[in-house]
Swiss-Prot record:
Source taxonomy: Bacteria, Pseudomonadati, Campylobacterota, Epsilonproteobacteria, Campylobacterales
Protein origin, superkingdom: Bacteria
Residue numbers binding Co(2+) 2: 215, 226, 344
Root EC class: hydrolase
Natural source organism: Helicobacter pylori (strain ATCC 700392 / 26695) (Campylobacter pylori)
Protein name: Aminopeptidase HP_1037
Cofactor(s) essential for the protein: Co(2+)
Family membership: Belongs to the peptidase M24B family.
CDD domains documented for this protein: APP-like (cd01092)
Amino acid sequence: MKGLERESHFTLNENAMFFECAYSCDNALFLQLDDRSFFITDSRYTQEAKESVQPKNGVLAEVVESSDLVQSAIDLIVKSSVKKLFFDPNQVNLQTYKRLNSALGDKVALEGVPSYHRQKRIIKNEHEIQLLKKSQALNVEAFENFAEYVKKIFDEKESLSERYLQHKVKDFLTREGVYDLSFEPILALNANASKPHALPSAKDFLKAEHSILLDMGIKYERYCSDRTRTAFFDPKDFVFKREQSFKDKERQKIYDIVKEAQEKAISGIRAGMTGKEADSLARGVISDYGYGQYFTHSTGHGIGLDIHELPYISSRSETILEEGMVFSVEPGIYIPGFFGVRIEDLVVIKNSRSELL
């Protein structure tokens, strides 16, 4: 985000430090002091860090080897002329904060800003958008390959439980370990899909004419994808496509309402809207049909190095949508004990409109 690039700050979060210098590890502290930056880590990672860090805005992070990351950061801060240091309080434990605050005293003000580093990442550049697009394309391919697999083995196996299917879909997502998951996949059959983030059951088994809700994503060069489809299971013609035909009329009605809500939101979102206004496009459709109480979560969330980033597309979000923001549009209806539908795609604000990624 504009205005944050030259602010002095620190982070121990891996995705935040990767954004700053193109490298991270599980024991490091990234520190920016005015126009200098430092990647502080222990001896296990210093060589790799020196080989991997990349300049950002013309500044290359200096790799500092340390057995005490916080003390090394304190030493550097004290020597600098910095008067204020920003950090995300959600990423720093109380012990670290107290230690910094005690050592810096009145010389340097520690300024906690929730989601500070996510604010810096809220607008994606073209390179990031292309990585997200590739990640989502691989995700879509995994949906297609998994559907083919389920059709193929349905008659061969006596039973396919939710738990088995949820475990198996990971192989299609990761390409047997080539890619990491962006989150634990959600696979829910029939009434279990009425729980938005259902846990897979070993007691529920796939049968013809069941519904399947599948929400999943991978990481491509660390950038996340996220997609949800709800499908009718026909062993002869099973595809995670937008057009679905359910035998039960009530289920078909609910599915069509969610589909209409998502389409209205995607076609209606514009740069300059607030997240609240974007949310209302989808929520309004569902409410007008009388299902508002069953749409129990926000319409969307930003995505990038983290699966959940800014902006939030929710009924409380005052964030102004701008060019380059990437987020999900995922309305849903969840009828407890009966049925659940969610349809999710990623969009980017481009030329003042939302465009499918």
